[in-house]
């Protein structure tokens, strides 16, 4: 076989492969994509979802979205805002470490819609397993000083807490075999942040 013919055959094969559409992700793969996109700010997952669904890419950076949900729309550059942004960065790190992934699914198709219940597990802070250590005296500090100390206390807990497994399930649905599986009841990002910050009483 001449080098020119070999090159031509390789070119034909690569062109055919490029034109072959990628298979539609399974319910489990679809959940993993959405989890990586929403909870980890994964740009590759976002691009894949946009290509599959036609959903426009978000204009807000994922880190900025987390910051807005933790700190709010505060614009003043003061100690309270800086502490809030420190907490926001720690929350973003904890979100990326949740590593929510599917563990299996069950089909429950109806007449007009295909449904899959996808089970998944995540890693979340296990505050209850932590040594109580010294009593928390942040509540006794006056005014802003107590509030700032409270934020630093939460940051320290997020940094030191061991992880526990959080298991749950979501509903994925599509109309037919050619459609993409989409989540129907995935908790929003704000709810995941609240879960990470659900400190023991």
Label every PLM stretch briefly.
Residues 2-8:
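Sec-dependent signal peptide recognition
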Residues 9-18:
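Hydrophobic h-region of N-terminal signal peptides that target proteins for export
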Residues 20-22, 105, 159:
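Second-shell loop/turn segments in exported
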Residues 20-94:
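Core segments of small alpha/beta cavity-forming domains
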Residues 70-143:
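Surface-exposed, charged secondary-structure patches
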Residues 85-88, 150-156:
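Short Pro/Gly-enriched beta-strand edge/turn motifs at strand-loop
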Residues 99-103, 153-158:
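N-terminal post-signal-peptidase region of extra-cytosolic proteins
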Residues 129, 138-149, 159-201:
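Short beta-strand edge/turn micro-motifs at domain boundaries
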